[in-house]
Amino acid sequence: MIYTLTRGSLLGSTCKLRYSSLFSYLSTAALRLGFENPTNGNPMDNSSHHIGYVNGFNGGEQSLGGFQQNSYEQSLNPVSGQNPTNRFYQNGYNRNQSYGEHSEIINQRNQNWQSSDGCSSYGTTGNGVPQENNTGGNHFQQDHSGHSSLDELDSICREGKVKKAVEIIKSWRNEGYVVDLPRLFWIAQLCGDAQALQEAKVVHEFITSSVGISDISAYNSIIEMYSGCGSVEDALTVFNSMPERNLETWCGVIRCFAKNGQGEDAIDTFSRFKQEGNKPDGEMFKEIFFACGVLGDMNEGLLHFESMYKEYGIIPCMEHYVSLVKMLAEPGYLDEALRFVESMEPNVDLWETLMNLSRVHGDLILGDRCQDMVEQLDASRLNKESKAGLVPVKSSDLVKEKLQRMAKGPNYGIRYMAAGDISRPENRELYMALKSLKEHMIEIGYVPLSKLALHDVDQESKDENLFNHNERFAFISTFLDTPARSLIRVMKNLRVCADCHNALKLMSKIVGRELISRDAKRFHHMKDGVCSCREYW
């Protein structure tokens, strides 16, 4: 599905004027604000645009509970060895804390967890392994002399074996031992990355039994974990049960909605946040731009960008500009995104983002043009895939895919299938069940989108090729093997095709089962023939 729109083709006259006025502002924004390209600066610079926070808050001046807050920096991810993108331990300018109650201190060499009573602190060593620093007070970790040691648990976590890690901490609890919070947060992150919902529920129980309801940071991590698992309902239950919330709490639930294809709910949550008298920060606006991109509502996003600096006095940083390029280009507004990038001072982040997204939408000419600009600005950004005209695969995506494979333990079955292969008896059974279901689909209006079958074959063969797509067999297999009315989950590492998207909606409606389908783009929540993406992904 390619969305390539002409410049301003979907904008009304009023919106065109607003759009033109906004670009006029942006064309000189970098110069007027004294903004510099962060790639040209000191990599250890702690200025607000470098760390992603704006409006003068960089966390370097604020003190809480006797500890000075550090600028927003993080240690290496214990699994990938790279800077983590999760938000479990962010502190920035105290976004994760309820003022005066809870303190987190993080820098590039260690991660410390400070309990609310200021008595016990936890951290990680340089290799990402949690360690305990006892200063009296509460202890969440006891000496353990069972079959598995803490070192073994850390090793299992580093290998991404989520199920095994959860089994170990469950067995320890049965023996009367409790795992410390840093390790629980670590495992929670792994559950979210691996989309291991059942294990996530166990970790949720462990965390809540270790902290009080007032520990906002812990509950924020649970929301983020459920967001990664695609369980909006569980994340929302946690959110609604919290007596107190901070900026990161609201940010997390907005991100959860957007990440799961529910952009309108994300915008509604943002409106509720403001109605309750809260003031957003620069980080929250990035989530709003993401939600508007999910909705494909460029005008809504531009209005929020306008309000960011006019109503709240937040000075845009490069991360905001990159978010705007994504908001415009991901729905297919490539001409508008190009105009936006051209209005700014040349910046490799903007051109690289547009290069990748234009190639995703099949605009190879624009992609090559952006590649030339990236090469001029910083040739080191181009890897082998980029130079070949492909969209580079992020190392973080490879790590997550590895975690998802490792999350499958002994209680998971594996079916070997190829398109159209019914040589195995179990595959033949699935094929016949799916064929029967297809007849019901046709009765309620299903028409195969044969244009998506690219092989040069006759019409019947094209329809059959679409019929044999693997996610349909995954659906029918899960339907036959699970209890009635239970939720069906289908995870895929490729973008779902439009025909399968239509088919899965109808299949879900016919069998009366809610379906959560995860493709390379986003989560699709399907129920009663309607998808949360609203036919846009």
UniProtKB/Swiss-Prot annotation:
PPR repeat intervals: 145-179, 180-210, 215-249, 250-280, 281-316, 317-347
Transit peptide: 1-110
Keyword flag Repressor: no
Keywords for the protein's UniProt record, in alphabetical order: Mitochondrion, Repeat, Transit peptide
Region (Type E(+) motif), start-end ranges: 412-442
GO biological process: RNA modification
Location, primary (coarse class): mitochondrion
Ranges of compositional bias, category Polar residues: 113-140
Region (Disordered): 113-148
UniProt GO cellular component terms: mitochondrion
GO MF annotations, alphabetized: RNA binding; zinc ion binding
Compartment(s): Mitochondrion
Any Pfam family the entry gives: DYW_deaminase
Organism superkingdom: Eukaryota
Region Type DYW motif, residue ranges: 443-537
PROSITE patterns linked to this entry: PPR
Family per similarity comment: Belongs to the PPR family. PCMP-H subfamily.
UniProt-recorded name of the protein: Pentatricopeptide repeat-containing protein At4g32450, mitochondrial
